[in-house]
Structure formats: C-alpha cells, structure tokens
Amino acid sequence: MILPINIYSDDILRLKAKPLKGVDSAIEELIASMFESMRNASGIGLAAPQVGRSIRLLVLDVSCVSKCEHEKPMVVINPHILSVRGHNDMEEGCLSVPGVQGYVVRPAAITLKYRDEHFAERTGEFSGMVARVIQHEIDHLDGTLFVDRMEKRDRKKIQKELTALASGIVDTEYPVVEREVVPIAKPT
C-alpha cells in the first residue's frame, strides 16, 4: 500500500522516534508499504516518521543509483552508529522536503549496529551512498532534516522554498499527508 509522505513542518518530523521491541505482522506490512511508497516516489531511503509512524525503522534501496546497482535493499531497525570515518560533501534531497536540494557534509563511512527485518542483531560497515542514506534516514529518526545540516549561507538560498512548503504549497508526483493550512490573519 502506498502511504502518504509527511512534508516539511509536519510535527512528526521533529520528534525523536521510539525504539521497536520486535517485528510482528503489522511491522512487516509497514516495511512492505514503506518500500512501495519509497519506490513510488522515486526515493532511495524512507524513515517511518516520514509516513506518520514515530518508530526507529528505516528502509533503503540505492540499487537505482549509478555505481550502486549491486547494493541490496535494506531494512534497518533501532540503528546506532558505533564509529565514523572520513567526511564528504554531497548534494542531498528528501521526499519530505520536495523540490529542495542542498549540500551536506557527512562521514564517508560508518560502523552501524542495528536489527534487520527479522529483528536479528547486526553490525555492518557501510560507505559511500549507503552510508549517506543511512545517516540521512537516522536523522529523521532523531527529528533532524537534511536542511538543518546545511551551511547557514546555503540554507538562506532555499528559505523561499522552505517557507512555501511550510505554508502548504507542495508540488509532488506522490501522495503527501493532507494538512489544514490556516492563513495568517492580516491586521485590520
């Protein structure tokens, strides 16, 4: 089932998500819906808060990205970054901030402890695009958006777009969470 995406300024995107205690049929269904929703929106990563669930769950599939065709889709539950190495600056975008891109400096490689779709504990080394997407999605679990990590001068360049999104002006090819936009009253 394709789920609507929460958009910039939706409160759930600023909450710290709660850990999962296990995987049941409802979580399995959510995981399948998250993959379907992510692919429908031409995304490469999606965190549960982006689809209205404040839990520490994310999915990613970077196999559509050049030089990443060999990468397998991943389910990451309750992630914890154990260590980081190096840094790189790369342009990012986000399904929750449609139409906005910006450069973000992130560690180039990470060691990650997490649980998989069967709730089995895993530790893995990730680099390149996979490491970047995991970090971007973990930020969602912590209530942080990529625009928060942009340099101040770069963020000023996108302020107009962020203001439009916050006021409900959203243009996407995928479903988004409907919200009531209350116009600001003008003084009489």
UniProtKB/Swiss-Prot annotation:
Catalytic activity, as annotated: N-terminal N-formyl-L-methionyl-[peptide] + H2O = N-terminal L-methionyl-[peptide] + formate
One GO term (biological process): co-translational protein modification
Q: What does the note under cofactor report?
A: Binds 1 Fe(2+) ion.
Q: Which cofactors does this gene product need?
A: Fe(2+)
Q: Is Metal-binding found in the keyword set? A: yes
Q: Which UniProt keywords apply?
A: Hydrolase, Iron, Metal-binding, Protein biosynthesis
Q: Which residues bind Fe cation?
A: C94, H136, H140
Which protein family is named in the record?
Belongs to the polypeptide deformylase family.
Q: What does this protein do?
A: Removes the formyl group from the N-terminal Met of newly synthesized proteins. Requires at least a dipeptide for an efficient rate of reaction. N-terminal L-methionine is a prerequisite for activity but the enzyme has broad specificity at other positions.
Instruction: Specify the protein name.
Output: Peptide deformylase
Originating species: Pelodictyon phaeoclathratiforme (strain DSM 5477 / BU-1)
Instruction: Name the encoding gene, please.
Output: def
